[in-house]
């Protein structure tokens, strides 16, 4: 953890350049070149060398995984980090792993995705009014980034939300890690934080006022659709769809089940 924090002080700390990302496309390109956290770089590349048997024919992405979705989205979804054999393999967040299977099926069910499955970057999947991102863009060992790695990655997420700010009206926050990571990011991106800070819980809602010009932002907390949460029924498909619908409503998206996009 200490090493990751020291990394942020180096002149070549890649995320220092995040404010120069003038568009989400450019920011995504910049993110994919980052090698700031030695532990994460080693792990993502090791996972690509020692592949799971089911994916031995794959050429793994093995780089930081950027956000996915339109640049004018009124709704964002913030998760945790790419999975070693999911996003780290396919190059798209929540794609190719059980968490993504649950999330994209739910997004499709509420009318926010063009298809219920996500298998690879060229599968034709589109999101309607939603952008998905994470506080940590590299796959971490045991799906557990350190706080230092989270802080090193923070400028990327802050800049992404700044670029989304003209249209962003709501964020669905999946899991306690993302909930805890967001306050300094949101403050930097232009919203006021309530005091005391709200405690994470499934279904928790918080309305943030803008720090200056702009519109307020509603946060909707939800359990992360991890394999464990889904298998133990800590989170069910119905519960996941509910928080996504609430986020969509807060974002002004009129969802239409299954296909056609919002308002179809």
Predicted regions and their residues:
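Ala/Thr-enriched low-complexity intrinsically disordered regions
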Residues: 7-8, 15, 264
